[in-house]
């Protein structure tokens, strides 16, 4: 029983938000109040504990999710601080996959921003229960209630407002707690915020507090039947009953508790920690994790208990100067001992566990074992990458992995010397292990190495890391759009025979395939392979070679040399020769048949479309819209926000280079914009013609 009790007191949470909403500052305050750090690290001093990479301290943004553990009122809170910049979506996606709950931090002035929406949707995808902290209420222009309304309008959230602020901007001194109906204030000399005073609710806020308390009870009644019954009968609710109902609604994903304050001014952080413990789930509150047997079909479950067989998911790889490769892992069931042997069921490879570390942002403590509910880093894994399952060899299971977006931008990189060339290949291999959205290919024609990623900042930082961590000196080309190719219709019975039977050992392979398009949304795979051969007409050992050959050919496309995506290849039939057939022969046949089939399947060019949001004064609205239209943009919505107009549009990335300068000159620097990848869409024929001609040099 003790083990289950201990798990009930664990909270695995992420802190997520838009860039600059104050996520890292909030996390730093949590570490301070829970006694992990003795001096608060300020982001703007470049001293935050969680921002441990050199680039993060220079740029004041969080790039990699730092993991850390702290204690609060008898509970263990494991926190992952995630980046808010859109180029690092992959880090957010990975963290959410292994968390039980999250705190969304909002900027009280800006409200719900584009990346907030993005992260919220990612959290919806993994059903992560979450609460909200409206931060920066000490800043000019802060508006708590507008921010709450935006949660409803933009996120489709059901906010449970548990606090209202006492004063805003310079007068922000505390919050009214609507559950206990009391005021919590941080005044005077307790600037560090260690102590807060509990007072009567100020008279001028009594009506507001009563109104929002009533709204809180109404919302709870809407989402919880037990509250509804008592509420309709006019019964009184104890504090315990209200808290239990909020917890039920939060864990079920029906509502989101909202708290507020100013982390930088040390106001509102302790009540937020209380809420994490009171309302966010422990590993026992969330459903058992679903997986499949090694056949990829039989459904299996793993409960969060130490008596179940061990299973865990690798969600991040990091290279440490002293320890080499570290694999971050969430343990879902059982116990993991250092030195034990486990199986990587995703790849069907054995792995030996080296040392196990409990991570703080940039320090670590060694542990002899880890158990269900832990988030740890493991040394010594050779074959494991992000999204792989590790499990007990006697009870294998494959847990659901993660899907990552296709990169949208690429640059050519040329090492300055021969020595740099060698260092570059090591650097690229390491960085690609750490980051699934970073891709590399060799351009056959120019001999250049081309790297691609999620945006200019992403590539800047990767190139910067190559220089700092691996001493690679290289020339970097101009950023190019990462176009893709796809097919529009299904083709059947396309065949290819590869034979070379002149003297010595020959080569022979014949394959017949069908090729069909897959949906191009972000949650669908970009490639699927199916084997429908019957009667051993192609021996089993050659089938993976056909798949491998096809995947090789896909890298170089058929129209203009861009990778082919969104296709499903089915091997229908084929033929082999007792002596002359080999894996190599079938690999070549797989590669050639894919090209032939794709040419017949009405190929098309795809380009990345960006969701662009421009905030502009009313008088520049016409210019902004005209400019978006001239860039082949599609206006999707226009709305008013805090006295300015907001235009939301989908615009091809190729038309967005240099946009920041144009927008500045059209609006005298008064407009701002943000953009993030939305989806791939077909390039209009006239534009496609130009791109293909340029790529093929015709």
UniProtKB/Swiss-Prot annotation:
Keywords associated with the record: Cytoplasm, Elongation factor, GTP-binding, Nucleotide-binding, Protein biosynthesis
Region of interest: Disordered: 289-309
Homology family: Belongs to the TRAFAC class translation factor GTPase superfamily. Classic translation factor GTPase family. EF-G/EF-2 subfamily.
GO cellular component: cytoplasm
Protein name, per record: Elongation factor G
Ion transport recorded as keyword: no
Binding site for GTP: 17-24, 81-85, 135-138
UniProt GO molecular function: GTP binding; GTPase activity; translation elongation factor activity
Cell location: Cytoplasm
GO biological process: ribosome disassembly
Domain called tr-type G: residue spans: 8-284
Residue ranges of coiled coil: none
Role according to the record: Catalyzes the GTP-dependent ribosomal translocation step during translation elongation. During this step, the ribosome changes from the pre-translocational (PRE) to the post-translocational (POST) state as the newly formed A-site-bound peptidyl-tRNA and P-site-bound deacylated tRNA move to the P and E sites, respectively. Catalyzes the coordinated movement of the two tRNA molecules, the mRNA and conformational changes in the ribosome.
Predominant location: cytoplasm
């Amino acid at each position: 029983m003790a083990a289950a009790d201990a798990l009930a007191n664990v909270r695995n949470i992420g802190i997520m938000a838009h860039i600059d909403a104050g996520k890292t500052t909030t996390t730093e305050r949590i570490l301070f109040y829970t006694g992990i750090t003795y001096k608060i690290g300020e982001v703007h001093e470049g001293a935050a504990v969680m921002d441990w990479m050199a680039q993060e301290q220079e740029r004041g943004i969080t790039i990699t999710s730092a993991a850390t553990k702290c204690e609060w009122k008898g509970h263990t809170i494991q926190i992952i601080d995630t980046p808010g910049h859109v180029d690092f979506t992959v880090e957010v996606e990975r963290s959410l996959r292994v968390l039980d709950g999250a705190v969304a931090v909002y900027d009280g002035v800006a409200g719900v921003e584009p990346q907030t929406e993005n992260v919220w949707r990612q959290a919806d995808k993994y059903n992560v229960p979450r609460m909200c902290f409206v931060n920066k209420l000490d800043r000019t222009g802060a508006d708590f209630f507008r921010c709450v309304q935006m949660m409803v309008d933009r996120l489709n959230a059901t906010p449970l407002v548990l606090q209202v602020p006492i004063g805003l901007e310079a007068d922000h001194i505390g919050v009214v707690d609507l559950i206990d109906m009391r005021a919590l204030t941080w005044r005077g000399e307790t600037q560090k915020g260690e102590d807060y005073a509990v007072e009567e609710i100020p008279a001028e806020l009594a009506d507001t507090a009563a109104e929002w308390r009533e709204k809180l009870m109404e919302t709870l009644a809407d989402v919880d039947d037990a509250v509804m019954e008592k509420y309709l009968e006019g019964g009184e609710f104890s504090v315990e009953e209200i808290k239990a109902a909020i917890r039920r609604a939060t864990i079920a994903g029906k509502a989101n508790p909202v708290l507020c304050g100013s982390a930088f001014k040390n106001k509102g952080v302790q009540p937020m920690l209380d809420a994490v413990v009171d309302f966010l789930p422990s590993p026992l509150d969330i459903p058992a994790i679903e997986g499949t047997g090694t056949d990829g079909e039989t459904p299996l479950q793993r409960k969060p208990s130490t008596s179940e067989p061990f299973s865990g998911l690798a969600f991040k790889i990091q290279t440490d100067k002293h320890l080499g490769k570290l694999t971050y892992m969430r343990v879902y069931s059982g116990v993991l001992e250092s030195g034990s042997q486990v199986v990587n069921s995703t790849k069907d490879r054995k792995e030996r566990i080296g040392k196990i570390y409990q991570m703080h942002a940039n320090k670590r403590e060694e542990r002899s074992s880890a158990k269900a509910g832990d988030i740890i880093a493991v040394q010594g894994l050779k074959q494991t990458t992000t999204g792989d399952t590790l499990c007990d060899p006697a009870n294998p299971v494959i847990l659901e992995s993660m899907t990552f977006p296709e990169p949208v931008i690429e640059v050519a990189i040329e090492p300055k010397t021969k020595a740099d060339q060698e260092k570059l290949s090591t650097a690229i291999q390491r960085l690609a292990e750490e980051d699934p959205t970073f891709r590399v290919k060799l351009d056959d024609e120019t001999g250049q190495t081309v790297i691609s990623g999620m945006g200019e900042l992403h590539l800047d930082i990767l190139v910067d890391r190559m220089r700092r961590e691996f001493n690679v000196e290289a020339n970097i080309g101009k950023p190019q759009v990462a176009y893709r190719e796809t097919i529009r219709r299904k083709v059947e019975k396309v065949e290819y025979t590869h034979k070379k039977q002149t003297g010595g050992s020959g080569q022979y392979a014949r394959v017949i395939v069908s090729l069909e398009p897959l949906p191009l949304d972000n949650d669908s795979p970009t490639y699927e392979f199916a084997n429908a051969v019957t009667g051993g007409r192609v021996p089993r050992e050659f089938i993976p070679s056909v798949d491998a050959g096809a995947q090789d050919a896909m890298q170089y496309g058929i129209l203009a040399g861009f990778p082919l995506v969104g296709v499903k290849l089915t091997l229908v039939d084929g033929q082999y020769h007792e002596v002359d057939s080999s894996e190599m022969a079938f690999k070549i046949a797989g590669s050639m048949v894919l090209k032939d089939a794709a040419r017949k399947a009405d190929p098309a060019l795809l380009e990345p479309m960006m969701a662009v949001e421009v905030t502009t004064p009313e008088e520049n609205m016409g210019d902004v819209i005209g400019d978006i239209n001239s860039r082949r943009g599609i206006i999707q919505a226009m709305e008013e926000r805090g006295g300015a107009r907001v235009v939301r549009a989908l615009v091809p990335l190729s038309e967005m280079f240099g946009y920041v300068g144009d927008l500045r000159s059209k609006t005298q620097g008064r407009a701002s914009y943000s953009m993030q990848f939305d989806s791939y869409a077909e390039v209009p024929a006239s534009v496609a013609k130009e791109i293909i001609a340029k790529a093929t040099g015709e």
